[in-house]
Structures are given as structure tokens and as C-alpha cells.
Amino acid sequence: TPSPVSVITANEIKRAGITDFQQALTMMVPSLSFRPNAMGSYLMMNGLSNKHVLILVNGRKVTGDITGNIDLNQIDMTRVKRIEVLNGAASSLYGSDAIGGVINIITNEPKDVVAFSSNSSYTRKNQFSQGLNLDIAQGKIGSYTSYKYDHSDGWQNSHLTEDGEDIIETIAPLSLGYSSNNFSQKFTYDATDQLSFYANGGYYNRGLERPVEREDITGGSKYNTTYEGYNWGAGAKYKLSKRNVIQFDYSGNNYASRYKYLIENSGYLPGQYALTKLQKFHDAELKGIFGFTTNSTTLFGVDYRREVIRRPESDKERSLYTSSAYGPH
């Protein structure tokens, strides 16, 4: 039995006044829930966590922390053409990452246009978002540039907290402050009506803003946590006919988390960084999509993945290689 697919288009997003990815998903799929964490929002789908929900952009996996945490704020809603949600297990096609479901974001890449757009929003607690897009597409060549900045001061509901049977003062926030930057660039080239190429790259960072630890009050921290990622990719598509396509895609991602010390601690001075985790992800896929009959689609493909993680305490890299071939109909 096929799993149900929900689709929300750019026009529906605009009419509903949706400004972020979390709002769009909440409207689409009642089985989705969110709760805040250091990476932004922790997603739950059909009772399963981020780790078992596959998030794709134009069919390519979005990577984050190895535990499955992905900062959903890095999805630029001004670029979204539509969002497709496969609500239910899809592990036979996508692997164990997709036991809870699949979310695929399709972005808009207009042709024969020179356009610049700016989108800003400001809400309570000094929550600010600014997005900039520049599209230059003429003839066979296209360039699509995006930048998004997000900031929040964080807040606390009460300056008091329980400590056993006592009520004491605290500076611990209910929601952490943060600042993030997200830059992406994509180039496309249509060599012929049948053959096209693309190359893309991006940079992302997010820094948390905790209150500094103090001796006279609880709730402070010795350090802030920062997250940083680079990604790059390239691919080609050859159209044998209207319903028959051969496609190659490669993507890479480096992701690191660090402590930025606020006070002198563990041999580090204020302002110095300590690496806590480094991840590398590489994925290469060659596939063919064929419409042998009017009402069916058949895929044949091979996929190679390499994942690497390094922790400073071990000073060693651990690698995992995965090769697979598939042919669902």
C-alpha cells in the first residue's frame, strides 16, 4: 500500500502567511510535532525523532549533527516551490533514515530572469530574520544566490527556579539566544535540450548565546556552543526522452561543533574555541528513471556513501562506507 503524500505549494505558503519551515510542516502534517533545542527545533514524526525522518532538498539529503539534529531555520522559505511529505515508512526506498517519513523541499529556479528580493521579519524578544536572493538566468546559464540571517535574544519566563524545597534566583533562559548565517550559491548550465549540469556550494553557522556563569547566581554557563558547516555538490542530467532520464549527483558536507569559552576553563581563555565534534559526509549516486509504461515509473541506480566522524578526545577518525544498488518499480 503506498504511503500518503502531502504537498504544499508556494502559493499556498504565501496565502497562509507562512514565514518559516516549521509553520509550513505543522500546517501540512498533523502527526508532526516540534520542541526547541540547541539546534533550533527538534522534529518528531509519527512518534519518531529527527534521526528517522529524512529531509531532502531537491532530492538530496540535508545533513546535520550525527544524532539527526538539523537546524530547520536554514531552510529558506522564499526559495521553496513546493514541499512534499511522505507520511509513513519509506525505508525500502530511502533506507533506515526514512522509517518515520520523508520531507522533500523543491526549490524554485526561474529561467530568463534577473531578479533581486529581500524579506525581513521582526517579532518579540528581538527575533529578527533577513533574507536576500539574487537570481540571474539568461539563456543556457543560471546563477542563484541566497543569504539568510536569523537572530534571537532568548528569554526566560521567570527569574526564579526550584532547588529542592527552596526557590532561588536564576539567570537560566527558557529559550537560548542565537545568531545564524546561511549562504548558498548554485550555478546551472543547459548544454543542450537533453543535457544539463549544475554545481552548488554553501556555508552555514549558528552560535548560541548563553548567560555567563556567575558565583552569586545559578543558571550561567562556562561556554557557548557553535555549529558550522560547509557543503558542495555537482551533477548532470541527460534526458533520453520525456519520461526517461539518466542522472548523476555528488554532494559533500563538513560539519563541526565547538565550544566558545566565556570564562577561563579547562586551559582555554575567554573567546577561545575547542572542537567537540567533526563530521564529513560524501554521497555519489548514478540513477536512471524510466517510464516503460504509461502508468508506472522504474528506477535503477547505484549509490556510494562515506561518513566520517572525529572526536578530539580520541584524536581518531571513524569511517563508514556504504554501497548499494536498487531497482524499485
Predicted feature descriptions by range:
Residues 1-12, 42, 50:
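N-terminal periplasmic "start-of-domain" segments of outer-membrane beta-barrel proteins
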Residues 188-205, 227-329:
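Face-selective signature of the C-terminal outer-membrane beta-barrel domain
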Residues 22-60, 81:
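Extracytoplasmic beta-strand/coil segments of soluble accessory domains associated
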Residues 13, 25, 83-84, 103-105:
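Non-catalytic regulatory/gating segments with a bias toward low-complexity or hydrophobic composition
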Residues 60-87:
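Short acidic/polar hinge/loop motifs at secondary-structure boundaries
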Residues 104, 111-113, 121, 136-225:
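Periplasmic-side early beta-strands and strand-to-turn transitions of outer-membrane beta-barrels
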Residues 41, 101, 114-116, 128-132, ...:
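Hydrophobic, lipid-facing positions within transmembrane beta-strands of outer-membrane proteins
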